[in-house]
């Protein structure tokens, strides 16, 4: 299913999330199972299925990584069950530096400063990747689609690192 069509968007990485939320509420009202309580079993089942599609579409388009994956899947590139690793040497080196910095936080004289520096580093790198991804997803070339898939892989890795950093920060606050 093309969630961009469902929510009446042109396929694009940058979408107005406020408009997305508004269209989500409209679709929810239109397909909500309570609206079909007195209809046939088949119509009620269809309403439940449609509600699930609307919910999944909203969650997909709301999240930038899932949105990019969806755009790539519409172009025949499925990253959902992928085990391909990033082969970009510079990114792998950066990844190792981040991992070492994560390990050093607890022994640091000022753990919060280290955490803040890592959050800033992640944000700067994520911004760089997102700019590349936006340009690559707006292109019609197969090569750019494959490059976009690499950016998504990197963003997924960074999301895991960000979650790990958040867990470390939470543990230090306890």
UniProtKB/Swiss-Prot annotation:
Organism: Shewanella sp. (strain MR-4)
Source taxonomy: Bacteria, Pseudomonadati, Pseudomonadota, Gammaproteobacteria, Alteromonadales
Superkingdom, natural source: Bacteria
Domain J stretches: 2-74
SMART domains given in the database record: DnaJ
Gene Ontology terms for molecular function: ATPase activator activity; protein-folding chaperone binding
Membership in a protein family: Belongs to the HscB family.
Annotated protein name in UniProt: Co-chaperone protein HscB homolog
Record's GO cellular component terms: iron-sulfur cluster transfer complex
One Pfam family matching this protein: HSCB_C
